[in-house]
Amino acid sequence: MKIAGFVKNSFVDYPGKISSVVFTQGCNMNCWYCHNRHLIPLEATHDEDGNTSPYYDSEAIIGLLKTRRKIIDGVVISGGEPTLQPGLESFVKSLKEAGLNVKLDTNGTNPGLLSRLIDAGMLDYVAMDIKAPIDKYAEICGKHM
């Protein structure tokens, strides 16, 4: 997985829980109001000096999260759009095997993967961002629905 950001402690991202937040790189929308615009490109962007944003190692993040089980109640996977990540299912499985609650923030554009994760009992909370009325998606999100 392309993990482009990590927050050790959040009291606001998972209602009623203390969580860590993992931010994935890449989104299939281009919402003009996005507060994580640097995560929209499928690859990390370069800063003014030409440096690429580093990705976090997924296994290292899982290891760190396992050590924080007594501090956090769960993990939020956000982005970008997490369901674009090829390694999402195995990442979530590792978190569940570690006894952590998992919240997924998604734009809902990958319903097949979302259904698989829900049906497998791998998600404890799903926050689906409905961005606009269906007839306004192209204008607001840069994508027809």
What feature does the model see in each segment?
Residues 1-23, 30-50, 67-70:
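N-terminal [4Fe-4S]-dependent radical SAM core
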Residues 26, 38, 130-134:
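Short, small-residue-rich loop/turn micro-motifs
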Residues 27, 31-34, 95, 104:
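Hydrophobic packing within well-folded, soluble alpha/beta domains
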Residues 39-59, 80-86, 137-145:
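Conserved non-cysteine loop/helix-boundary elements of the Radical SAM core domain that shape
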Residues 62-74, 83-145:
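Conserved AdoMet/S-adenosylmethionine-binding subsite of the radical SAM
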